[in-house]
Amino acid sequence: DCGYTSTRDIFADSWEKQCRLPLFPLFHLSDLWCRILYGWSFAKASPLDAVHRCRLPMLFIHGDKDSVVPVEMVHRLYEAKIGDKELWILSGVDHGAAYLHDPQIYAQRVRTFVEHWFECPAILEQ
């Protein structure tokens, strides 16, 4: 739900469009700071690569009015996914609000996906 393609992409979108801050040098300085303090790089945080490598069935959910993660990103994630996948774009829904938009439909859609692709009776009985 609300998946983004890469740290760089989400920084570029939020900093340049919402905050009016340049991606360079802020992204590179932030990346350097994380490497020094935490020992990891933003380049290693790539949902796009992770989705491409994952062989499990995947359900992509996104609101078409997402103000934080552009809906175009879920289309790129969906295209990167090899194998079984499903894309659900909710009309008029903002960031993180897919469940709140209609909890019953959301739960049913996720349940249907899980029942179709996975065998997990303990979860499905609840």
Residue ranges: model-predicted function:
Residues 1-43, 49:
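Hydrolase active-site cap/lid region
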Residues 4, 65-66, 94:
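Catalytic metal-binding/acid-base residues of hydrolase active sites
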Residues 9-12, 71-72, 100:
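Short, well-ordered secondary-structure micro-motifs
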Residues 43, 67-73, 98:
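Conserved alpha/beta-hydrolase "acid-adjacent" motif
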Residues 47, 56, 70-79:
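Short alpha-helix in the alpha/beta-hydrolase fold that links the catalytic acid
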Residues 53-55, 59-62, 66:
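Short beta-strand/loop motif that positions the catalytic acidic residue
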Residues 75-98, 103, 109:
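Catalytic histidine neighborhood in serine/cysteine hydrolases
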Residues 100-126:
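Catalytic active-site module of serine/aspartate enzymes centered on a nucleophile-bearing elbow/loop
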